[in-house]
Amino acid sequence: MNLSPLQAISPIDGRYRNTTESLSKYFSESALIKYRVYVEVEYFISLCEIGLPGLAKFDKANYGKLRLIHEQFSDVNAQEIKDTEKVTNHDVKAVEYFIKKQFDDLGFQDYKEFIHFGLTSQDINNTAIPYTFKLALNEVYYPNISNLISKIKELATEWKDVPLLAFTHGQPASPTKLGKEFLVFAERLEIQLNNLKNIPNSAKFGGATGNFNAHHIAYPSVNWVDFSNNFVNEVLGLTRAQHTTQIEHYDQFAAQCDALKRINNIIIDLDRDIWAYISKNYFKQRIKEGEVGSSAMPHKVNPIDFENAEGNAGIANALFEFFAAKLPISRLQRDLTDSTVLRNVGVPMAHTVIAMSSTLKGLNKIILNNDAIAADLENNWAVVAEAIQTVLRREAYPNPYEALKDLTRTNQKITADTMATFIDGLNVNETIKAELKQITPFNYTGVF
């Protein structure tokens, strides 16, 4: 069955399919099956490499043929496995039977009982899933977040000299530079991105209850811990958890979810700030011919990209938070609740990719409105009160804070003339008065 985006239940496979399609290579049902096959095949090859008696005659020259099983894996193969699952009612066993059939076709039937040798399903799932998650991070997520950070830095450079009225508690505060405000988000994202990259992609590989019972009973002379560490860490490029139950701890995966959530929180914060600046008319948005902003109000040009991003990041975070709280908890040596949860691991990643894409799209649309920014600065001369009282403190002037408070903390508008009159009335020398009169909302922006 070919599912049209029009029939998809979730918008990530429907409305937003063009944005999320790259993730289907890692998180679709077909992808999960493919990478289960990958792990099973590579495991068989690794068993051959340690010289087990039952595999001693397997020709290493045939490794390439084995790897073609997963390298050329197709949706037709995936459907064949799904058809087998209808009989077995077990997804991983269906994968095992598929590979055994491939061995029969290749003439390797004498060795097929070493497929899935000594393993439980979670040895496959708890390697295949973190492997696909690692691939998705490296090939989709990291490039997307890097593009977003690059755009933020680009705007920070472009607008590094633009003075901007700051707002704390929603009220005018000491001015800042627009470029610096973008650097705040770039710095935050880079720090959290680095934290995410330093979290190991943890995997489990140790038999039915994590003790290599079956492996050890069959070949007690083999150091199965060393074998598995090499297979998981070196062949698969993951990090093997040393002491487990039937399943992976998921503590490191929970840490990855928490890190992704923190990054999304920063994106939400950025989206809301840009939304607020647009509402203040500090930014205008590029208008595309033919687009409509409202079904009723013809004039509307809404900040829909930032609102879309905020909504999708919020959905992603709800799931990341659930994964981080739920997955590390499992009854005794294992219950099945992690299985259905892990099948949804691509969902928050998809919403995250949509959020990043929408934010980037929105940033590419915004146009600086210098006139509105300058007008707000000109209308808020009270914000230089901090500067004046600080210089007066330096000069040991009595009660400067209180004097500026009495001047500015009223309901009267403070203008350049108001400040000049106040400065003229100060009992300080003319040099200090001249210094104070040089301070304006446009140049009182600190060191950035």
Task: Say what each PLM segment does.
Residues M1-F212, Y219-N230, G293, N399, ...:
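A helix-coil-helix interface module used to build multimeric assemblies
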Residues N2-E29, G64-K65, V292-F448:
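Catalytic-core signal marking the mid-to-C-terminal active-site face
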Residues V92, N126-Y142, T157, P163-I329, ...:
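Charged, flexible cofactor/metal-binding loops and thiol motifs
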Residues K60, Q246, K405:
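Residue-level "edge-of-site" marker
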Residues E42-L47, F98, Q102, A136, ...:
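Generic, well-ordered alpha-helical scaffold segments in large soluble proteins
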Residues E49-A56, F108-Q109, Y142, E158-D161, ...:
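Intrinsically disordered or highly flexible coil/loop and linker segments, enriched in small
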Residues S121, H216-P220, V235, R240-T244, ...:
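A structural signal for small-residue-enriched, beta-sheet-centric alpha/beta enzyme cores
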